Amino acid sequence: MDLHQKLPWHPDTRSNHEGKIQGLQLRRDDVSKRKFRWVSSAGRQDGSKAECWTHLVGPPQETVIITEGPMKADVIYALTGQSVLAVPGVNSLNHLKAALQYLKENGTKQIMTAFDMDYLSNPHVTNGYRELSGILASLGLPYGTYLWNPEHKGLDDYVWEYCYHQGS
């Protein structure tokens, strides 16, 4: 499936709910330390610092999924039509509260979390999930957690595999 045909925008765009570009990430050739780096122009005239923005794919719906990684969100949305809010990483929740408040004000009634399945065993992911739970509770947003076969690390992998087998 060609994602460019399915999506009304280019999947590398990191935009807010108004469609304005918030940030730019580059994928590193050497991913042994970090896969992605935020681009910053803070030292230049009219430059901006790199921030860990959220990425909303699709319109606010009654139920919205939260996952880690904007590309995962793009894939999940393209394959399911379910709106997804992505954080750059499980411990990068700086702008999450504002994004969740926007969703709540625009009809979202429930959040389903979908962090990678290693949240069950990775203490960094577990801590991020705990912080996310606190933010959701503080906003009064009911939430649940999607679980799937851990052989598929992310929900995007699981949905892709499911769609692949449906088509064969």
Residue map of PLM features:
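TOPRIM fold recognition
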Residues: 61-64, 71-168
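Phosphate-handling DNA/RNA-contact segment within nucleic-acid enzymes
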Residues: 1-107
